[in-house]
């Protein structure tokens, strides 16, 4: 399956930014994170309970990897991921932060969303804390550099994209309306 335009950029930046990392935070793979999203009603705050949940997530992750491709797992993960500010899933995140559909995201916009997946609170581009907003910009630039190293964008394109500020069209989604 070959995607074109920004859909390809999203897929490629996510693959580079997430799949090629050994974990997605807390020592878990993307498959394990998806298992936790899909099948854990409430993540235990108690360490002992959490230790009991982890093996179940591992078993589910192995089953996910048996039945789905990496791309399908990644799609499910992005469709369930909480990008903060009522933006659950890549479609809502694209709309919330940039006012567009995922297929219309620019490379630097997709890179910012991918960067948030590592730790949305630390890389929240609309945080009141200016340091956290700086973190979001820095993380976006790391994802762009990873895309350049993987050959998805040129060095010159990476440099020009990294020079851009975070241009948001932020609109908080109210699901109660």
For the regions a protein language model found, what residue spans apply to each?
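Single conserved hydrophobic/aromatic residue that forms the stacking wall/gate
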Residues: 1-5, 9-10
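Active-site-surrounding "flap" and adjacent substrate/cofactor-binding loops of secreted or lumenal enzymes
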Residues: 11, 19-24
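Short amphipathic alpha-helical surface micro-motifs
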Residues: 12-17, 95
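Non-catalytic, structured segments within soluble enzyme domains
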Residues: 26-177
């Amino acid at each position: 399956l070959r995607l074109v335009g920004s859909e390809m950029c999203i897929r490629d930046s996510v693959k580079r930014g997430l799949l090629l990392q050994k974990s997605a935070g807390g020592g878990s793979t993307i498959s394990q994170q998806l298992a936790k999203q899909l099948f854990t009603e409430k993540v235990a705050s108690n360490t002992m309970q959490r230790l009991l949940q982890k093996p179940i997530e591992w078993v589910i992750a192995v089953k996910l990897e048996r039945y789905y491709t990496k791309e399908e797992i990644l799609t499910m993960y992005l469709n369930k991921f909480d990008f903060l500010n009522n933006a659950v899933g890549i479609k809502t995140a694209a709309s919330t932060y940039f006012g567009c559909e995922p297929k219309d995201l620019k490379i630097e916009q997709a890179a910012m969303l991918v960067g948030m997946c590592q730790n949305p609170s630390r890389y929240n581009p609309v945080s009141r804390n200016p340091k956290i907003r700086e973190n979001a910009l820095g993380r976006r630039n790391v994802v762009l550099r990873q895309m350049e190293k993987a050959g998805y964008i040129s060095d010159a394109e990476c440099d020009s994209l990294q020079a851009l500020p975070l241009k948001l069209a932020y609109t908080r989604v109210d699901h109660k309306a």
